[in-house]
Regions:
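Short, well-structured N-terminal submotif of metal-dependent ribonuclease cores
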Residues: 1-40, 53-62, 135
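A generic structural signal for short hydrophobic patches within well-formed alpha-helices
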Residues: 10, 45, 122-123
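Active-site neighborhoods of divalent-metal-dependent phosphate/nucleic-acid chemistry enzymes
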Residues: 74-116
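Structured helix-beta-strand junction loops
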Residues: 33-35, 71, 92
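Acidic, PIN/NYN-like endoribonuclease modules and their adjacent C-terminal/linker elements
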Residues: 2, 104, 109-135
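Histidine- and aromatic-rich ligand-binding microenvironments
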Residues: 6, 40-41, 96-97, 119, ...
Length: 135
Protein backbone atom coordinates (compact mmCIF):
# COMPACT_ATOMS: atom_id res chain seq x y z
CA UNK A 1 0.00 0.00 0.00
CA UNK A 2 1.39 3.39 -1.02
CA UNK A 3 0.78 6.35 1.29
CA UNK A 4 0.59 9.91 0.00
CA UNK A 5 2.61 12.35 2.13
CA UNK A 6 1.30 15.89 2.64
CA UNK A 7 3.48 18.99 2.96
CA UNK A 8 2.84 19.45 6.65
CA UNK A 9 5.00 16.46 7.63
CA UNK A 10 8.36 17.74 6.33
CA UNK A 11 7.41 21.25 7.44
CA UNK A 12 6.73 20.13 11.02
CA UNK A 13 10.04 18.27 11.03
CA UNK A 14 11.88 21.39 9.84
CA UNK A 15 10.04 23.69 12.23
CA UNK A 16 10.37 24.51 15.90
CA UNK A 17 8.93 22.71 18.88
CA UNK A 18 5.41 21.43 18.17
CA UNK A 19 3.39 18.36 19.25
CA UNK A 20 3.33 17.14 15.61
CA UNK A 21 7.10 17.36 15.11
CA UNK A 22 8.05 13.95 16.56
CA UNK A 23 5.20 11.96 14.95
CA UNK A 24 6.08 13.55 11.58
CA UNK A 25 9.77 12.78 12.04
CA UNK A 26 9.01 9.19 13.07
CA UNK A 27 6.81 8.65 10.00
CA UNK A 28 9.35 10.13 7.56
CA UNK A 29 12.11 8.01 9.10
CA UNK A 30 10.02 4.93 8.26
CA UNK A 31 9.62 6.21 4.70
CA UNK A 32 13.36 6.82 4.41
CA UNK A 33 14.19 3.32 5.70
CA UNK A 34 11.78 1.68 3.25
CA UNK A 35 9.38 0.44 5.93
CA UNK A 36 6.65 2.58 4.37
CA UNK A 37 5.98 2.89 0.63
CA UNK A 38 5.21 6.57 0.06
CA UNK A 39 4.74 9.18 -2.62
CA UNK A 40 3.89 12.84 -2.87
CA UNK A 41 3.06 15.25 -5.70
CA UNK A 42 4.42 18.26 -7.49
CA UNK A 43 1.72 20.32 -5.78
CA UNK A 44 3.02 19.31 -2.34
CA UNK A 45 6.51 20.40 -3.37
CA UNK A 46 5.11 23.71 -4.61
CA UNK A 47 3.39 24.24 -1.24
CA UNK A 48 6.69 23.77 0.60
CA UNK A 49 8.47 26.24 -1.66
CA UNK A 50 5.62 28.74 -1.56
CA UNK A 51 5.22 28.79 2.22
CA UNK A 52 8.87 29.23 3.12
CA UNK A 53 9.54 31.73 0.32
CA UNK A 54 6.47 33.77 1.36
CA UNK A 55 8.05 34.03 4.81
CA UNK A 56 11.36 35.08 3.29
CA UNK A 57 13.13 31.78 4.02
CA UNK A 58 14.33 30.88 0.53
CA UNK A 59 17.31 28.84 1.76
CA UNK A 60 15.10 26.86 4.14
CA UNK A 61 12.61 26.30 1.30
CA UNK A 62 15.37 24.75 -0.79
CA UNK A 63 16.68 22.63 2.10
CA UNK A 64 13.27 21.22 3.07
CA UNK A 65 12.42 20.60 -0.60
CA UNK A 66 15.67 18.74 -1.28
CA UNK A 67 15.50 16.64 1.89
CA UNK A 68 11.87 15.72 1.30
CA UNK A 69 12.50 14.64 -2.31
CA UNK A 70 15.44 12.56 -1.06
CA UNK A 71 13.20 10.86 1.53
CA UNK A 72 10.18 10.56 -0.77
CA UNK A 73 11.45 10.39 -4.37
CA UNK A 74 8.20 9.20 -5.94
CA UNK A 75 6.59 12.48 -7.00
CA UNK A 76 3.31 12.32 -8.90
CA UNK A 77 2.50 15.01 -11.47
CA UNK A 78 -0.67 17.08 -11.42
CA UNK A 79 -2.57 16.54 -14.66
CA UNK A 80 -5.66 17.97 -16.32
CA UNK A 81 -7.56 14.87 -15.18
CA UNK A 82 -6.51 15.68 -11.61
CA UNK A 83 -7.74 19.27 -11.80
CA UNK A 84 -11.03 18.07 -13.29
CA UNK A 85 -11.48 15.57 -10.45
CA UNK A 86 -10.53 18.32 -8.00
CA UNK A 87 -13.31 20.46 -9.44
CA UNK A 88 -15.76 17.59 -9.01
CA UNK A 89 -14.66 17.05 -5.40
CA UNK A 90 -15.09 20.75 -4.63
CA UNK A 91 -18.68 20.53 -5.85
CA UNK A 92 -19.39 17.26 -4.01
CA UNK A 93 -17.67 18.22 -0.74
CA UNK A 94 -18.04 22.02 -0.49
CA UNK A 95 -16.31 22.48 2.87
CA UNK A 96 -13.02 21.00 1.64
CA UNK A 97 -10.37 23.42 0.42
CA UNK A 98 -8.91 23.52 -3.06
CA UNK A 99 -5.46 22.23 -2.08
CA UNK A 100 -6.89 19.30 -0.14
CA UNK A 101 -9.23 18.51 -3.04
CA UNK A 102 -6.33 18.60 -5.47
CA UNK A 103 -4.23 16.26 -3.33
CA UNK A 104 -7.21 13.91 -3.03
CA UNK A 105 -7.78 14.01 -6.79
CA UNK A 106 -4.15 13.13 -7.51
CA UNK A 107 -4.38 10.30 -4.99
CA UNK A 108 -7.65 8.87 -6.27
CA UNK A 109 -6.55 9.11 -9.91
CA UNK A 110 -3.43 7.11 -9.00
CA UNK A 111 -5.22 4.46 -6.93
CA UNK A 112 -4.00 5.78 -3.58
CA UNK A 113 -6.43 6.02 -0.69
CA UNK A 114 -4.22 6.71 2.35
CA UNK A 115 -2.65 10.04 3.26
CA UNK A 116 -0.17 10.96 5.98
CA UNK A 117 -1.21 14.42 7.14
CA UNK A 118 -2.30 16.33 10.21
CA UNK A 119 -4.95 18.13 8.14
CA UNK A 120 -8.38 16.96 9.27
CA UNK A 121 -10.01 18.37 6.13
CA UNK A 122 -9.25 15.07 4.40
CA UNK A 123 -11.63 13.27 6.76
CA UNK A 124 -14.59 14.63 4.77
CA UNK A 125 -13.40 13.36 1.39
CA UNK A 126 -14.95 10.03 0.31
CA UNK A 127 -12.35 7.41 -0.59
CA UNK A 128 -9.55 9.06 1.41
CA UNK A 129 -8.24 7.60 4.66
CA UNK A 130 -6.19 9.97 6.83
CA UNK A 131 -3.64 8.05 8.88
CA UNK A 132 -3.29 8.62 12.60
CA UNK A 133 0.24 9.88 13.14
CA UNK A 134 0.55 9.43 16.88
CA UNK A 135 4.06 8.50 17.99
Amino acid sequence: MTIFVDSNLPMYVAGGAHPNKEPAKHFLEKVRSGQIDACTSTEVLQEILYRYCALGYVDLAAQVYELFVEICPVVLPVTLADTERCRDLLIAVPKVGVRDSLHAAVMLNNGISSIATFDRGFDAIPGIDRLSLVA
